[in-house]
Structures are given as structure tokens and as C-alpha cells.
Amino acid sequence: MRISGVTLFRVSSQLRNVVNGQWTTTHYTVKDRSTDPRWKDVDLARESDVYDVVIVGGGPSGLSAAIRLRQLAEKAQKELRVCVVEKASVIGGHTLSGAVIETRALDELIPNWKELGAPVYQQVTSESIAILTESGRIPVPVLPGVPLANHGNYIVRLGKVVQWLGEQAEAAGVEVWPEIAASEVLYNEDGSVKGIATSDVGIGKDGAPKDGFARGMEFHAKCTIFAEGCRGHLSKQVLDKFDLRTHAMTYGIGLKELWEIDPAKHRPGYVEHTMGWPLNVDQYGGSFLYHIEDQGQPLVSVGFVVALDYANPNLNPYKEFQKYKTHPSISKQLEGGKRIGYGARALNEGGFQSIPKLHFPGGCLVGCSAGFLNVAKLKGTHNAMKSGMVAAESIFEDIQQKGEDVQTIDPATYDKNIRDTYVVKELKATRNIRPSFNTSLGYIGGLIYSGIFYVFGRGIEPWTLGHGKKDNEKLIPVKDAKEIDYPKPDGKLTFDLLTSVSLTGTNHTEDQPAHLTLKNDQVPLDVNLAVYGGPEARFCPAGVYEFVPSEADESKKRLQINAQNCIHCKTCDIKDPQQNINWVTPEGGGGPKYEGM
């Protein structure tokens, strides 16, 4: 009998929740290691290393910061030790984006990027914007200067660009460490950030040390740059500790597939964005579809973004994406093709209003850890890179002024300097587009507002709209919500969830403490399921959360957490109604293995 890889994935996803014959949901009882007899004879001392700058996260912002630091050091003929730690098994392995990029930051950072062979070669040749109805399509003119106009931009596979940036960083003298998960922020006695510690390895799911236990390592630095991306685990901690955020962030979830399509249907350089169907008029979101030729392959990046401030707990972002692909204008481009990739990632949609204070004693936030995505443009790579570069310049200036013996850098000029760049200026100009869709006029009101105040005024209005309540506070009880009917997948154009997850390559060491932790085990049943119908089973794009019959009483439910499936999108950490789910760092190397996503 032949067993498919997807079948094995389904079975193993269930069995991984059995420990010593007992079903587990999420976490073991945390015990103080000093009083836990299982740890009595274990050496818990950590080795440490000292750098000038430690960067957490090997994405566009972190790598740009690293490269810029080394460029400045070389120009000044100064020794400067810089390292990047990245939790993915390879640089670019956790990167997922559309992506159409502006090259302005890349032009500045590495002017000869074309000669160096950067995987940035598919220029936008044509584009369209439309509002979809269930079977129709209403074209929207692409006026020069509107946020979604893409003349002069490039379609890329961002994971490949990030991999290339990693190579440039190493060539510049940066120490780049993939498969290293930063799990803890270290502090000096005065409360300033001292650096980070990496995760321990070799701990069983029950919290006991295994034979191969190895203590994590400490990385100390004058300044630590947090470049973890949207809703970073450590970034979230420093935001709270230093009280950096004044206004709440609002988020979206972006889901993406990569297709190899019929060459006869391929239009290299074509970019398409849509709004409307299948989402309701009171729901913010939309789609992207990009034709890119990559080494002769006729590829299409197709994706769907759903704002996470939605109210209906029955909404399923993954199924909305699958439904979108059945639209006649979309399906005709994909039919006859083969899907070769899938993934999802939360993204920042707060914009200008939600930018936090960016610096603090011993560190700073860059890229999507700070929230520099321009949701009106559906672009953030250029802003992420530029923020990393500006942070690097501020840090290097401080080291130069205060001397190499300085212990802690608080790069205060970074906050001011970034606000003088195009990064914050373009976010300010588009600041009211996203929240305008949350007015009483809904979707139509947002379109009208954007047309009047941005297209003709470029954001000059003297007011700034707010985002209102946090995303997790906006769900309504399931008894008050409209049911949503989703068609069954056909296995050709639309797919079931676990088949999709199998394309992510996601994997975690099975016998390790689950990284999806619950503050209270009863909240999923007493609140999430009882009041909201169990929304975590729908908003997760990887099938991590399931409500299944309890073994003790089949008339009752229990929450099963398939942590092995997790693709590190962070949606659960954002949308869980009671903020009861806390995403923590698993062992390094775990998670998805995206290839050029």
C-alpha cells in the first residue's frame, strides 16, 4: 500500500500530541529549575560572546542594518563586530511576501546590485486594479501617484533576495548565524538591554532535560537591533518593558501560493490587485497576483490579505483565499498550472499612527518589528531596509562619539532621523487610508475617502483617524454572527488546509516544549469555544488548533494544539480574543522551509 506524504503529515500531526500515553494540548507545568529535581545535576551556566552590535532576525531590515554597519566601519577603518541570528534553518527560509518592491533602499545600500547578481530582474510591465463582484469585475484606473501604482518597480521572490542579502552581509564581514533562535532578552543591572540569549536545546515536551541537552548561549552587545518581523517574540517584550507604544497596532494575515502556470497564459511583469469579493463590504482586505519569470519558469505569485480586525468569528482567512481563486478572472490564469508553494504571515497594517518609540537603552526596533509596512502600497521591503540602514548609521555615530569602550548605546537619533526620511513621510501621507475603511460607511466609505483625500490631496488633511480597539477585541459572539458557507476544495484549483501546509516544509523537533503556550487551559473552552465558536480553529492558516472530542467524555470538547504544523505566522498571538495564546520561540531551525516565497 502506498502512503502519500500528505497522509503521513496528517497522522503525524495527531500523534505528536501524545506524551507518555497522555494527550497534551500546549505546555507542561512550568517549574523553577532550581527546585525541580530533574534539573538538580544539570549545569545551567551559559557561554557568552561579545559583539558591538547583535541583530535579531535575518530579514531585509536586519541584514541591511548589518551591511550598513560594516560599510561604515570599513570607511572609518574601525573594527566593528556585528552578528545576525536567525531562527530559520537557512537565511530566507522564513521569508514570505508578495512581493513587488521599490529598489530605492537597495540602490542606496548596494548601488551595483545588478552587477553583483541580485535576484531582482522582473520589472513590472503592466498592471491593473479591480473591484470584484461574485462573477464580475469593475476596473479601477491606475492613476499616476496612487499608492498601488507600480511603474518602475520589480516583482521578486523575496526569500531569494534575502538569501542574497545574507551572502552580501557575510562578504562584508558580518557573522551570520542561521538556525539560532533568540529566546530571551538580557538586561544589565540598570535595566538597559545587554543582549540576547539563544534557546536551550534538548528539553523534552514534559520539561525535563534530555541526554542531548545543551544550554543556550548569551550574545552581549553595545546595542541590540530587533528585526524579527511582525509581532516578533522579543520585540513584543521590549515594547512592553519600555512602554514604547502609544497607539495600538492593527494587523492583517497574508496568505500566498506560488504557481507554475501554462506558458501560454504567462504575462511576465503583469501585476494585479483586487478588492471586494469574496469579502463582505465591512471587511478590509484584498488580493495580489504577480506574473514573474524565474530562470525560465512561468510563475505566478497569488495571495490574499485579510485584515485581522474582522468581527465575524466564522470568517476563515484560508478559505476566503481559496474561494477568491474560483473567480472567473482569477481561475482562468491558474487553470492548467501546478501549485508549488504555500505559506502565510501576519503583517502590520497600523501605519503612521502605530509607529512606536523606536529606541531604548541598549537597543532599537527596525522593519516590521517597528511597523513600517505601507499597507496602502502593499509594500514594506524598501521601508524595512531603509530603517535598518538609518538605525545602523545612528548606532555607529554613537559608538564613534562615545568611544569603543562604551557599554550601552541608546540610539536616540535613530527616531528623529527615520522621521526625516521617505519612510515616515510616505506613511504619514497614507495614514488615513486604512482606518477610513472602518468608518460607518464601511468599504465604500473607505474608497471614497481615499479617492478624495489621497489622490487629490496626498494626505494633507489636518486630522489623523484612529484604529479603535485592538484586533482581538473586535470579535462578536458567534450567536450574533452570520454563518459563512465555503465550497469544498476540488484538489485542482482549491485545496484542503493540510495539503497546503505540507507544501511549507514546516517541521519542529517533536519532543520539545510546545511553543504555543496557554496562560489558562480553560479559556479556550469557557470563552473561545463557548462564546466565539472556537475562532482559533479558523484563523490559523496551518491547522494548528482543533476542537476535538474529549477522551474522558466524548460529549465534550478539548483543544488540541498541533504545534508541529505551525508556520510562525503569529496570527494566533494577535487575534486570540483573551490574549491567552502566547507564541514563544521554539528550538532554532524549526518552522517553515520556504523556498523563494
Swiss-Prot record:
Question: Which segments occupy the membrane without traversing it?
Answer: 91-112, 409-426
The entry's free-text remark on the cofactor is: Binds 1 [4Fe-4S] cluster.
Cellular compartment(s)? Mitochondrion inner membrane
Residue sites binding a ubiquinone per the record: G285, G286
Please tell me one Gene Ontology term that the record gives under cellular component. mitochondrion
Cofactor requirements of the protein: [4Fe-4S] cluster; FAD
Which GO molecular-function terms appear in the entry?
4 iron, 4 sulfur cluster binding; electron-transferring-flavoprotein dehydrogenase activity; metal ion binding
Specify whether Iron is a keyword of the entry.
yes
Might you give the EC number(s) for this enzyme? Answer: 1.5.5.1
Superkingdom of the source? Answer: Eukaryota
Give residue ranges for domain 4Fe-4S ferredoxin-type: 557-586
Pfam families the UniProt entry points to? ETFQO_UQ-bd, Fer4_ETF_QO, NAD_binding_8
Which reactions are catalysed by this chain? a ubiquinone + reduced [electron-transfer flavoprotein] = a ubiquinol + oxidized [electron-transfer flavoprotein] + H(+)
Annotated FAD binding lies at 53-67
Per the UniProt entry, the signal peptide is none
The residues that the entry says bind [4Fe-4S] cluster are C540, C566, C569, C572
Q: What class of enzyme is it?
A: oxidoreductase
GO biological process entries: electron transport chain
Q: Which InterPro entries match?
A: 4Fe4S_Fe-S-bd (IPR017896), ETF-QO (IPR040156), ETF-QO/FixC_UQ-bd (IPR049398), ETF-QO/FixX_C (IPR007859), FAD/NAD-bd_sf (IPR036188)
Q: Which UniProt keywords apply?
A: 4Fe-4S, Electron transport, FAD, Flavoprotein, Iron, Iron-sulfur, Membrane, Metal-binding, Mitochondrion, Mitochondrion inner membrane, Oxidoreductase, Transit peptide, Transport, Ubiquinone
> Tell me, what does this protein do in biology?
Accepts electrons from ETF and reduces ubiquinone.
Entry's family note: Belongs to the ETF-QO/FixC family.
Quaternary state and interactors: Monomer.
Protein name listed in UniProt: Electron transfer flavoprotein-ubiquinone oxidoreductase, mitochondrial
**Source species:** Caenorhabditis elegans
Q: Which gene encodes it?
A: let-721
